[in-house]
Amino acid sequence: MSAAAAPAPERGWKSEKVDEAQALARSCAARRPDFQPCDGLSICATHSHGKCFKLHWCCHLGWCHCKYVYQPMTPVEQLPSTEIPAKPREPANTIQISVSLTEHFLKFASVFQPPLPPDSPRYCMISDLFIDNYQVKCINGKMCYVQKQPAPHSHKMSPEEVSAHDAFISKESNTPKIDHCSSPSSSEDSGINAIGAHYVESCDEDTEEGAELSSEEDYSPESSWEPDECTLLSPSQSDLEVIETIETTV
């Protein structure tokens, strides 16, 4: 008897839970009249994922669970639509701008010319930045700048030019010579011949200072400038010796 009586209280407990769940579902559904109870035939996604994707609702014990209530989407066929006329009933007072601009462009297309190509970049040589009016001369083991002699004129000078040239030579001979390898304090251009005089001293004489610079015991970076022979460098060679290591961006 006890075994048969046991299922009765269990069924009563389940029925109470069902009534409670249904009452909760009814109160929830009362606020959403668009929801309907599950018909028991459709498979509702709420049972597996907790979401209902149907227009009807269903969940635990066949009624809506307030936790998973979603607004259904409006069917496409119920959306408002606008009728599109097949042909305009009356001519519109508008023009197609693209067609008008195209016609206007084709009328004047022959007048248009392509833009001029940009000028190619101009590069300058580093030697062009310096005035090549001097020569590099080795005197007593030192590299000195000596002004170049002017190029001889091919045309014959008039008597007036000859007299003026002779007067200039006599004046130049009376001018005292300045040491062209002097220090910057005694010459404004620090070694460059300032008065334009042409020096013809021989390089055969070696002073004690030149001997000291050429000795192997007291070697210094300046001694690397001393040539083996005392020669008169041409302007092109002087550019290589003096200007080769200069990097300039123009």
From Swiss-Prot:
Cross-referenced InterPro entries:
UPF0524_fam
Gene Ontology biological-process entries: circadian behavior; nervous system development
Keywords for the protein's UniProt record, in alphabetical order: Neurogenesis
Chain positions covered by the region annotation Disordered: 201-250
Superkingdom of origin organism: Eukaryota
Q: Which stretches are tagged as biased composition: Acidic residues?
A: 202-229
Tell me, in a sentence or two, what this protein's role is.
May play a role in neuronal and neurobehavioral development.
Q: Which family does it belong to?
A: Belongs to the UPF0524 family.
Indicate what this protein is called per its UniProt record.
UPF0524 protein C3orf70 homolog
The organism named in the record is Bos taurus (Bovine)
